């Protein structure tokens, strides 16, 4: 089984080394690692080159790509798609430049995939960490059929997807700036694909990010997406509740 990782980055020098250190410390290292850089002007590219020099002698293929720009395409899902198109692995993980793995993350994913060969993706619980390094909570994957109309039921940083699944249902919709992952999970669910699960948290996610800083747009996108897939009434209720609570 060939495992590929993708990290998209832009001026990520503050957190990137922590992410890369967690990859080098894996008990099962990735076979391939592709970076899509959005035009960094800080030390991001230097850090990536240093990582490449450390990783490649162990057999990991590392490529650093400049992000391609497409008119009217949201930058983050567009960069994800560029990485997906470039990698050659059987399973693909997306590691954000401010997130990091537990040392057993990829080994755990591989074990679950071997035990559930018919699944389309694997979901890992993700630990939310504040700016001081303290755990706020753990986001455990939720039942898609119950929670999908209301919320994103899976932590995207903990999602490892087979390349065959992307081939079957497509990559990310670049029309959504914030909630392209939510749209993708809806398509996964509608296609009737199976999801397998890792029991323990394997990913650490630093709180913040685009969705948390643009809550109104995130609410509007999730309402639009859920309505598109036939859950307008439930999605509208969830939208109103989030509007009232400011979430």
Question: Where do the protein language model's features map onto the residues?
Answer:
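Cell-envelope/extracellular polymer assembly enzymes that use nucleotide-activated donors
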Residues: 2-4, 32, 183
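Short, acidic, metal-binding catalytic loop of nucleotide-sugar glycosyltransferases
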Residues: 21-30
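Short beta-strand/loop segment that forms part of the nucleotide-sugar
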Residues: 31-39, 63-69
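A conserved acidic beta->alpha catalytic loop
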Residues: 37-46, 96
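Glycine-rich, basic loop-to-helix element that forms the pyrophosphate-binding segment
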Residues: 67-87
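Short aromatic/hydrophobic "clamp" motif used to bind/position activated sugar donors
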Residues: 92
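Conserved donor NDP-sugar-binding/catalytic core segment of glycosyltransferases
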Residues: 104-136
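Conserved nucleotide-sugar donor-binding catalytic segment
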Residues: 140-221, 225
